[in-house]
Amino acid sequence: AAMRVPQDAKPDFIFVTTKSYDTANAMIALRAFADRAIFVTLQNGLGNAETIARTARRVVAGTTAHGVTFAGPGEVRHAGVGETMIGAWSRVGESDLVRLRDLLADVGIVASVTSDIRTELWSKLVVNASINPIAALAEVPNGRIVRDKRLLGVLEAVCREATAVAKAEGARVDEDELRHRTILVAKRTAANRASMLQDLDRHHRTEIDAITGSIVTAAERHQIPVPLNASLYALVRAREAAFRVASA
């Protein structure tokens, strides 16, 4: 990983790994490579690939369900194995995707290539929105959500709302399959403290806008009621606002 990149570097791939709200600023620093490298995003939420593609010519979008826990500055702990998917977003060919897949395999990350990355992004968004805000507000690791019947009921209802929005947006998703996938991800990352929970623990800004906010915005566009997602969005934003007031 690099925070500063020599302007004469010639990377084949650049992975943008910032929080979603920092993507635009990251691309300002990386614009010298816009025509030289293939940019890769596995970030949470929607909108990252679009933001990157406004600067970079070639973009790969993807999703991953690997769980990671922040241990300290410059130190993270791998807390769960999950599926990784990659697909072409802008001016990327099959050979580029295969090369990236093989590169990831070399470092122990098994990735699959998909021809429908937009559906995968929406699927990951539904999973994320069904786990992250609940874990953050209940202050529990992912596994507790599926062991607690009350929290599991909330997860299933949030997932149901979000899936309806994903379908309206054109994603080829199935409600039962996504519910099963969400529960499986929570079990596989049972010990992981969701990124949104880690952010709130440190009184940092969360990615609620790119995750649940994307669902609420799309739901309004399609006039689909999503009361639970809207409530979770409002509650997490309220927690963020409380931190800002306390630090003022």
What do these predicted ranges mean?
Residues 1-75:
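Rossmann-like NAD(P)(H) cofactor-binding subdomain of soluble oxidoreductases
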Residues 11, 23, 48-49, 97-100, ...:
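A general structural signal for well-ordered alpha-helical segments in protein cores
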Residues 12-15, 121, 132, 196, ...:
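A generic hydrophobic-helix recognition signal that picks specific residues
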Residues 20-21, 91, 116, 202-205:
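Short, surface-exposed acidic/glycine-rich loop or hinge patches that mediate macromolecular interfaces
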Residues 32-33, 51-58, 62, 74-175:
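Internal alpha-helical scaffold of NAD(P)-dependent oxidoreductase catalytic cores
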Residues 156-248:
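NAD(P)-dependent Rossmann-like dehydrogenase/reductase catalytic/cofactor-binding core
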